[in-house]
Curated annotation (Swiss-Prot):
Primary location recorded for the protein, binned into one broad class: cytoplasm
Role according to the record: Protein and nucleotide deglycase that catalyzes the deglycation of the Maillard adducts formed between amino groups of proteins or nucleotides and reactive carbonyl groups of glyoxals. Thus, functions as a protein deglycase that repairs methylglyoxal- and glyoxal-glycated proteins, and releases repaired proteins and lactate or glycolate, respectively. Deglycates cysteine, arginine and lysine residues in proteins, and thus reactivates these proteins by reversing glycation by glyoxals.
GO CC list: cytoplasm
Gene that encodes the chain: hchA
Name recorded for this polypeptide: Protein/nucleic acid deglycase HchA
Family: Belongs to the peptidase C56 family. HchA subfamily.
Organism: Escherichia coli O157:H7
Gene3D superfamilies on file: 3.40.50.880
Keywords linked to the UniProt accession: Cytoplasm, DNA damage, DNA repair, Hydrolase, Metal-binding, Stress response, Zinc
GO molecular function: glyoxalase III activity; protein deglycase activity; thiolester hydrolase activity; zinc ion binding
Amino acid sequence: MTVQTSKNPQVDIAEDNAFFPSEYSLSQYTSPVSDLDGVDYPKPYRGKHKILVIAADERYLPTDNGKLFSTGNHPIETLLPLYHLHAAGFEFEVATISGLMTKFEYWAMPQKDEKVMPFFEQHKSLFRNPKKLADVVASLNADSEYAAIFVPGGHGALIGLPESQDVAAALQWAIKNDRFVISLCHGPAAFLALRHGDNPLNGYSICAFPDAADKQTPEIGYMPGHLTWYFGEELKKMGMNIINDDITGRVHKDRKLLTGDSPFAANALGKLAAQEMLAAYAG
């Protein structure tokens, strides 16, 4: 007999009127083991350049009916790209807007993954004790050791990052100083921080989570309501081109901007980023 899982969002008792994804949506879109593979970098980077991760520091995203979606950074979208980059020789630092700890969507953590979970445990302190982004931005110059900025996905990227002047300054520095920018799924919402000033990403093409898919997820209880705005629409208004309208695990390179469409693209994006950065810094 087939057991039917509920499509009702699950209550998050830590906050009033807040909800996790439904049992059904978790059964469809999460797994206890990731699809990590292809981690093969026989000549890793040995220098000082590293990755700056701009992580989410807020958990609750309001929806159109007043209910809160309990979110953060998606673990797969965060950890798989970093696993590849770390294996390729690039260390990383974590920063949040507030300097407070990174929020993760723990309901998507691959708890039985024998490679990803030890990697997370090894680096958990970086996420628990991040730098304050404003302090990082204040120290940026042409000689800074950051080779890339990485903005992980998860709906937590919709909270605060799109309005942050510090995010804008970090992205402007990266593009103008020929550094890589890496992101996937909802992470490119951070690019909206550039829309009210100098926008060096005007004309760039990316992969990202489609607005059309976000409009469907409440039907299966992934979110407890609809979003109040859609980041893809806003990115297009600021001159960016989203090349995908579906979710296939697609990745894309436009100059030094590397992007992926969803958690299904996390492993491929990690490979792409590691290969591109090795070619640039370890060649």
